[in-house]
Amino acid sequence: MSDILRSVGLDVGTTSTQMIFSELTVENKASGFAVPEMEIARRDIRYRSPVYFTPLLDESHVDAGALRELVAEEYRKAGIRRESVDTGAIIITGETSRKENARAVLDALSDFAGEFVVATAGPDLESVLAAKGAGAVDYSQRTGKTVLHMDIGGGTSNLALIRDGKIERTGCLNVGGRLLKFDGGGTVTYVSPVLTGLCGLKPGDKASPGQVKPVAEILTQALEMAAGLREETPLLEQLTTRGAGRFDPCREKELVISFSGGVADCIEKELPWLEFGDIGPILGQTIRESRLCGGEFTLGSETIRATVIGAGCHSAQLSGSTVFHQNVPFPLKNVPVVSLADISRETIRRELSKQEDSAILAFPGVNSPGYREVAAMAEEIAAGTGGKALICLEQDMAKALGQALALRLGPNAEILCIDRVKVSEGSYLDVGAPVGPALPVVVKTLVLGK
């Protein structure tokens, strides 16, 4: 028995905007009389939009109206109605997520993503999505090799170190193809603030490839430091993206470097330096000539589309099948996660008092709990929440806990208990209507840079 979910991935980046429509096949992987175990078994891409330049009113403001028209047109071309989309992700990435009107863009696009809306991708989430979408995670799992994936976009480079098919750590550097822009004659039109002290060019200067190359070399050196191929200097910290943790340089002796993002296409083939009106072509060729490509390296199976495929196909999870829900107004969108250090009514009250609206309480739970353990948890949660309980567990006990809460809070209370979903502090959840016995869930990290 299988179900089909229609999914959309929309990536609004510093340089480009693109969409992917895909179908996710959901199947029960359990056998016989076992508890149902629902998994996303297959991902089929049904439509790819062209890659568009992200519409901007100026260097600081995304044109939300033009972006909405672009998205509506792609839905029309794909032959897909908004109401037929079940799941997916709108990801605002790179420098675009720090534009002053990022929230307005989200508002303008929110009704295009079916039952799911993902806001801005923090550096960690964007790195994970890019590594998965580019095939770097699959490559590591298939070959057993350790991979450092670099998704080099317009404003930032998202890093992910992958060992045996598992992402160990992530990072983000202010290295990208649109940090320096030119008109058709080579006159500088924009210099990103992150290049302060690193670039001798300023808007209005007439530039040549020879003047641009040193800037590309500096950016490439930061990537080499992250890969452990160059001795670390303060440059690495200087170019670390605000909001991203420090990425300790790799120490692996055998490391495959994988590339995706718009600049990755410029690594593979040499293009005229003003092809895109930015530093991208020169940066790509500088990387190609650097230590990053001196050993084993590979271009992702998807380069410029890596993040959006990750959003459309990899952000959706399914809860366990023994869930409990009562009077829940599905879909729930952008509900903050509060990780509990202990399950006491005092802690629950204190943590919920910090929230402006509803929050999902997350804790590991107990493996194969007895009746008394479940009852004790339910007593504390019922007393702490005061009538509305949204719970996320790692252990398979959501149904038992939900039933115990319903006995204490009554038939009119809003109760949601899901399990088999791993979250962390600072995450947000979207929870959709039931698919068979499980619930579709999107775990998100929302960070709007200042």
Language model features by range: what are they?
Residues 1-37, 136-174, 448-450:
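Gly/Thr-rich phosphate-binding beta-strand-loop-beta motif of the actin/hexokinase/Hsp70
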Residues 1-2, 115-147, 237-247, 307:
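Conserved phosphate-binding catalytic cores of ATP/NTP-utilizing and phosphoryl-transfer enzymes
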Residues 11, 91, 150-151, 258-260, ...:
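Short beta-strand segments
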Residues 21, 46-72, 180-450:
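Helical "lid/coupling" subdomains associated with nucleotide-phosphate turnover
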Residues 21-22, 31, 100-104, 129-133, ...:
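Short acidic, glycine/serine/threonine-rich loops at helix termini
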Residues 56, 75-108, 256-272:
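Short beta-strand-loop/turn "lid" adjacent to the catalytic site in phosphate-handling enzymes
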Residues 94-130, 276-287:
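Glycine-rich phosphate-binding loop and adjoining helix at the ATP-binding site
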Residues 119-128, 151-152, 299-304, 395:
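Active-site nucleophile and cofactor-binding loops and adjacent substrate-binding regions
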